[in-house]
Regions:
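N-terminal acidic, proline/glycine-rich, low-complexity intrinsically disordered segments
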Residues: 1-25
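Long, low-complexity intrinsically disordered regions
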Residues: 19-47
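Low-complexity, highly charged intrinsically disordered N-terminal segments
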Residues: 42-104
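Alpha-helical bilayer-embedded segments of polytopic membrane proteins, i.e.
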Residues: 88-133, 208-223, 247-295
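Flexible loop/turn segments at secondary-structure boundaries
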Residues: 116, 290, 294, 301-307, ...
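Membrane-embedded catalytic scaffold of the fatty acid hydroxylase/desaturase
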Residues: 127-247, 314-404
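Extended hydrophobic/aromatic segments used for targeting, binding, or gating
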Residues: 268-269, 280-318, 398, 403
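Acidic, carboxylate-rich catalytic segments that either coordinate divalent cations
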Residues: 377, 405-414
């Protein structure tokens, strides 16, 4: 199987946008011409039931899995071929919106002693930070807009308003999470080092506190991600050298120091006597952004109907089986266009995991076709409202705080 991609190649797949596990290209200039990437995984078309098929896909033969892959490949290439000026205008429009909201919010908070200015400034800054992280940072760092060859909107140059340095986040998210999606013991986004999130994880007494752990994590989510990505538990296990972790902690501190200075020193100083009011507004905006992103992200892979997988499934996994795993390991959120924008289009989590390097504004366009493919192959297309899905997430976190807890069957398409 051959995939054509227009994003620049990199010597480190961990920082590449898009389908990093499929990329095996040599180093190239930052804005290289399109390269052809060969899928190194073996194809297993035999007409028999795949030995590694997850429960909701157990009825599919290898031939059907490869046919499904061909349809999804064709859909991806259709979108790639149609990218153009309208997409470029979209991302420039969102950047202008985000920067306008931030400028307006910061400006209003100069007068933060006035309650109305405080409320307006805090609200504008909260939305600006959400857009920065969700629709801009996350998606640009995936390489979704690299095809424009714009050095200012590129996965190799973009930095975001987030505690986690862009390069560190790309390694842990673009590579580890999108390669090993919902594979127990490999996908760190499953949170297995922090909470018990599957019944297969051994229960320990400290799990009783995980509802409180989850609450605390939601309040400091950006910092939790940043520290989590350093994998300090591996240092304790002796599988990661302290020297490496120490260097990563220094990089993290440099970024965190800038973030703290910006929000809690520099901009509050502009308010003069309103210093503390502005600092409180910035703290509120950061906290609300953290709570929102935590809810959206947890709803992408934790609700009922989403499957997790054994690591053995990765052995000889074909492109088609990778697609199936992404679909069964992800869940969508339903809502309005404004809601989708505020989630960074991660409300289309299934489409994002199938095609992480396609422009985010295209996910809503292709979602009906992806759903139709799922229905035709009798695969679940898990979706629901944010309150409904987040309620299921919280219920699961509480349930797994106690011993036991068997897996729930795959949900029917919502």
């Amino acid at each position: 199987m051959t995939i054509t991609t227009e994003r620049p190649t990199t010597t480190d797949a961990s920082t590449a946008g898009g389908r990093a596990p499929r990329v095996t290209a040599k180093a190239a200039a930052p804005f290289a011409e399109p390269v052809v990437v060969e899928n190194p995984l073996p194809s297993r078309i035999s007409g028999t039931v795949p030995t590694m098929a997850p429960s909701a896909a157990a009825h599919l033969t290898d031939t059907q899995v490869e046919a499904l892959a061909a349809e999804l490949d064709a859909l991806r290439e259709e979108v790639v071929a149609s990218r153009g000026e309208a997409d470029a205008q979209y991302i420039h429009r969102i950047i202008r919106l985000q920067r306008g909201l931030e400028l307006g919010g910061r400006g209003a908070l100069i007068f933060s002693l006035n309650p109305a200015a405080w409320l307006a400034g805090t609200a504008a800054l909260t939305v600006a930070k959400i857009l920065d992280n969700m629709e801009l940072g996350h998606n640009i760092l995936h390489g979704q807009w690299d095809w424009m060859k714009d050095p200012k909107i590129h996965s190799t140059t973009w930095e975001w308003d987030h505690a986690s340095p862009a390069k560190s986040w790309q390694r842990s998210h673009n590579y580890e999470h999108h390669t090993f999606t919902n594979v127990r013991g490999r996908d760190r986004d499953l949170g297995y080092a922090v909470m018990r999130v599957t019944p297969e994880q051994p229960w320990k007494p400290t799990d009783l506190f995980q509802p409180l752990t989850n609450l605390g994590l939601s309040l400091i989510f950006e910092h939790g991600i940043a520290i989590y990505d350093i994998e300090l538990e591996k240092v304790a296990e002796g599988t990661k050298p302290w020297s490496q972790a120490k260097a990563e902690l220094k990089t993290l501190w440099r970024k965190t120091r800038k973030q703290l200075a910006k929000d809690y020193v520099l901009f509050p100083l502009l308010s003069g006597p309103g210093f503390l009011h502005t600092a409180a507004a910035n703290f509120t905006a950061n906290t609300l952004r953290n709570i929102w992103s935590h809810a959206v992200i947890f709803c992408g892979h934790f609700p009922d109907g989403v499957e997790t997988f054994e690591e053995s499934r990765l052995d000889g996994e074909t492109q088609g089986e990778w697609y199936v795993r992404q679909m069964l390991g992800s869940a969508n959120l339903t809502g309005s266009p404004v809601f989708h924008l505020m989630t960074g289009n991660l409300s289309h989590q299934i489409e994002h995991h199938l095609f992480p390097d396609l422009p985010s504004n295209r996910y809503a366009q292709i979602a009906p076709r992806v759903r139709e493919i799922c229905e035709r192959y009798d695969l679940p297309y898990t979706a629901g409202s944010l309150p409904r899905q987040y309620g299921k997430v919280l219920r699961k976190i509480v349930r797994y705080a106690f011993p036991g807890g068997g897996p729930k069957p795959a949900a029917q398409a919502a």
